[in-house]
Amino acid sequence: MTNVVISGYYGFANAGDEAMLAAIIGSLQDMIPDVSITVITGNCAMTRENHHVQAVHRFNLFGIIKTIASSNILISGGGSLLQDVTSARSLYYYLFIMRLALWLHKPVMLYAQGIGPVRGVKARRAVRALLQRVSMIGVRDADSKQELCDMGVTKPPVVVTADAVLS
């Protein structure tokens, strides 16, 4: 069985983010019939009910550690998670989740991400340093790819994909 953890802005009743999560889950289930999916979410009950997956609360640090430790991969997926316009705190939260997976020697994949804007100098350095260590970067548009290029992200190769909801 393949254990996948998905991190994103889920469990807040945002229609776009929930549609993104449904698309990611559907794609994973099509590709990996025996996949077990756990979502890091703001509302475990809602995520379980709406998506029929396992869930761990986004502020349950020990639960997140345990979940990632027993997984095969972390997918940071969908939406514009890596930006500091709405909140620098959220940027550092998502970077922390990815860093945690890397500390636990788990591959990290960015899936259909919209990147930026990331305005702070320290924030740009933090994004660059972390993303240079992930296994795969998939962005949803050319502007996101350019933002990563402008930040100095040189590896892994950045792939422009369709927004998961549209694919």
Map each language-model feature to its residues.
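Active-site anion-handling motifs in enzyme catalytic cores
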Residues: 1-167
